């Protein structure tokens, strides 16, 4: 750290420093201190003088080249060109035994095993915790020097990772939640993302940043439920991803590892343990090309584009419309930036109708960007619609959270209107059978199991509304469950 000894601007005043004698800080010059440390550790003054002369000559030569050279030409992309990518490959078999969380863990394990340059850095990622959601569990035990806990400082995590990348390592930096990315946004925008462009391709900072994102889980609220992919995609030099299946998560992580490009990998907390979206254990051979979308359902009547948590809702809508004789094409974008314009454009040229669904808030979201570019590129008139989170924050109350986020109902109603189709809803009568199921949910977004520690009622008991039924213990907390209505306990 270099302490401030003068004002930032050209004014000759000491107003920029609170020290009475700024000259007293000159002995804190890190270059001078490093020179002294090297001398104390046996490096001769002659060697240091020779090194300084060599560096000075390099600076002088660079200055001459810059002064005498032609004016620089503008460049219109900040990204490092992608190397030739392999075709998409997911070995198909009927043995789907890994969730998204498990598949990502095995991809990280594979990367650690094949490259000693791979280093994982983040808050609480070492065992026994192995990340808030257990993503890195067992990895620090298997690779103790290369899976390391960090300080509780996102900017420090990315700063250290940038240095490691510039030194030839392959750092993977973990943000506990995507909501904390803004703390380190300047480092993403001005350092990691800009490094290749600033150095005219001489330097590159291939840092992979991983962050769990999104809502659709209890115990969240405004600090742990955002996705923020639009502000991340606004960074010119970073690739941004958000998968919705275990196979795509592993395939993209493997592709990112081979790309040698700065990458931000967002993964949806609502799907990390979804057993309907699992993959097989051949993780090392999973590969999903960067920038390639996936058509998860083929159709010709309307196009739905989405990514992350809303994807299962979009696919369910496609199934329901199919039963009514309407064929919806559903596209999983997978890569947010650079996104697959050709795939979406080809679909919209066929269907003439485009719906984009995302849980990020609406204004300046990716939905607006996708619709704008497709509208500019298509030769025909199209109808478009966005289904997003309104420009508001995500509430703590779970039912209110679900109302704010894109839902199956919102998707069905928007598509029906575009297709001039009628839709009606039947409200389930929970009192029709006389039974009311009491559901237990965790109080934390990382809770996956809820165990009953003490049951206060028995079968046949008569209970009142609000009466205590049980004490339960989730992964991160203990709580009590009360009866939502008066009645008789049945098993």
Predicted regions and their residues:
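Acidic, low-complexity mobile loops and tails
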Residues: 426-471, 480, 486
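Glycine-/small-residue-rich active-site loops that bind phosphorylated ligands and cofactors
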Residues: 127-128, 153, 179-180, 309-310, ...
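Terminal amphipathic helices with adjacent charged low-complexity linkers/tails
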Residues: 57-91
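A structural preference for short, hydrophobic beta-strand core positions in alpha/beta folds
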Residues: 149, 242, 330-332, 386, ...
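Thiamine diphosphate
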Residues: 1-61, 68, 78-271, ...
């Amino acid at each position: 750290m270099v302490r401030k000894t003068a004002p930032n601007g050209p004014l000759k005043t000491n107003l920029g420093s609170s020290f009475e004698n700024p000259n007293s800080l000159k002995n804190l010059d890190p270059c001078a201190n490093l020179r002294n440390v090297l001398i104390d550790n046996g490096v001769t003054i002659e060697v240091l003088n020779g090194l300084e002369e060599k560096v000075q000559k390099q600076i002088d030569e660079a200055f001459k080249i810059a002064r005498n050279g032609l004016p620089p030409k503008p460049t219109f992309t900040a990204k490092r060109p992608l190397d030739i990518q392999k075709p998409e490959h997911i070995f198909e078999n009927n043995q789907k035994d890994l969730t998204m969380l498990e598949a990502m863990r095995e991809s990280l394990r594979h990367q650690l095993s094949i490259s000693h340059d791979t280093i994982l850095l983040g808050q609480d990622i070492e065992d026994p915790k192995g990340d808030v959601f257990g993503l890195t569990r067992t990895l620090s035990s298997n690779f103790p020097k290369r899976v390391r806990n960090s300080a509780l400082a996102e900017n420090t995590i990315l700063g250290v990772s940038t240095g490691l990348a510039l030194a030839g390592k392959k750092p993977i930096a973990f943000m506990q939640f995507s909501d904390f990315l803004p703390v380190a946004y300047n480092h993403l925008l001005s350092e990691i993302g800009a490094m290749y462009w600033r150095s005219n391709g001489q330097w590159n900072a291939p840092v992979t940043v991983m962050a769990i994102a999104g809502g659709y889980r209890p115990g969240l609220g405004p600090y742990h439920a955002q996705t923020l992919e639009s502000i991340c995609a606004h960074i010119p030099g970073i690739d941004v991803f958000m998968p919705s299946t275990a196979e795509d998560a592993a395939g993209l992580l493997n592709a990112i590892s081979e790309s040698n490009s700065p990458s931000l990998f967002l993964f949806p907390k609502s799907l990390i343990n979804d057993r309907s979206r699992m993959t097989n254990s051949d993780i090392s051979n999973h590969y999903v090309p960067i920038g390639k979308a996936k058509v998860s359902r083929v159709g010709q009547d309307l196009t739905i584009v989405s990514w992350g948590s809303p994807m299962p809702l979009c696919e369910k809508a496609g199934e329901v419309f199919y039963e009514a004789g309407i064929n919806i094409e559903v596209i999983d974008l997978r890569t947010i930036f650079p996104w697959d314009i050709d795939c979406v454009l080809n679909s919209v040229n066929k269907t003439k109708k485009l719906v984009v669904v995302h849980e990020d808030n609406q204004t300046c979201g990716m939905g607006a960007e996708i619709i704008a570019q497709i509208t500019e590129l298509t030769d025909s008139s199209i109808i478009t619609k966005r289904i997003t989170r309104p420009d508001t924050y995500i509430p703590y109350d779970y039912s209110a959270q679900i109302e704010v986020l894109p839902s199956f109902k919102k998707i069905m109603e928007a598509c029906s209107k575009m297709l001039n189709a009628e839709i009606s809803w039947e409200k389930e009568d929970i009192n029709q059978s006389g039974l009311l199921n009491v559901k237990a949910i965790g109080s934390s977004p990382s809770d996956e199991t809820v165990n009953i520690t003490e049951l206060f009622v028995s079968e046949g008991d008569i209970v009142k509304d609000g009466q205590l039924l049980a004490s339960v213990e989730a992964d991160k907390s203990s709580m009590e469950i009360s009866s939502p209505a008066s009645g008789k306990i049945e098993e």
